[in-house]
């Protein structure tokens, strides 16, 4: 995968990172433009193309538009059709990377940032009051009663709510956009990337969530609640 992608790069694109997941069963390569894009709302992104494939049959070969939020190193694909997916084929022993499809996907890196910037600006224009934010938090992470759960379940939900509210109120990765729908999505995206789950496996888990589409699903859920 790395060699196939490297052979297609032009002068404006470079390989940002590459690696293996699941004990070598999943491979990924991230290609990006050299310059960041700063939106009018002050949210800086770096457009990327993520190429992934698997050697264990767990994932299809996929080219997908994404972006990195520079302020927090979060991955996002907000505003992109099909969550940024531009090419996909089921992995098999006979499957090959078609150069035409790969070149088409790489061309979109140059324009992929426009849709994300447009969505960021749309979200930043939607006001969200503290009361509305609290309602959103309660909907996305409801605290169960002891009749429906045990004390551990109640505590986990309360801790999750507390962590997201702290991001909204005090964390510089979120506070510049607090009071807007952009701040809501950024708070949850940052929580999922940097606070949720065990710290020891965070880097690999975040990348696996990106290549598998889980990050997109988590963001879509927040977007749906905001509507």
Task: Identify the function of each model-found stretch.
Residues 1-14:
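Amphipathic alpha-helical segments
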């Amino acid at each position: 995968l790395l060699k196939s992608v490297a052979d297609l790069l032009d002068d404006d694109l470079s390989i940002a990172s590459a690696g293996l997941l699941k004990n070598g069963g999943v491979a990924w390569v991230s290609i990006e433009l050299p310059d960041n894009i700063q939106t009018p709302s002050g949210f800086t992104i770096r457009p990327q193309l993520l190429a992934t494939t698997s050697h264990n049959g767990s994932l299809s070969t996929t080219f997908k538009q994404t972006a990195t939020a520079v302020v927090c190193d979060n991955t996002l694909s907000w505003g992109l059709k099909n969550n940024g997916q531009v090419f996909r084929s089921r992995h098999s022993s006979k499957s090959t990377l078609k150069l035409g499809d790969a070149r088409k996907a790489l061309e979109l890196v140059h324009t992929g940032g426009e849709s994300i910037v447009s969505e960021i600006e749309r979200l930043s224009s939607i006001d969200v009051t503290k009361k509305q934010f609290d309602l959103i938090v309660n909907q996305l992470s409801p605290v169960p009663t002891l009749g429906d759960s045990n004390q551990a379940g109640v505590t986990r939900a309360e801790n999750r709510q507390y962590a997201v509210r702290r991001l909204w109120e005090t964390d510089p990765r979120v506070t510049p956009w607090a009071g807007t729908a952009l701040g809501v999505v950024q708070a949850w995206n940052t929580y999922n990337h940097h606070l949720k789950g065990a710290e020891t496996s965070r880097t690999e888990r975040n990348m696996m969530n990106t290549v598998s589409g889980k990050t997109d699903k988590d963001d879509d859920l927040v977007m749906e609640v905001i509507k």
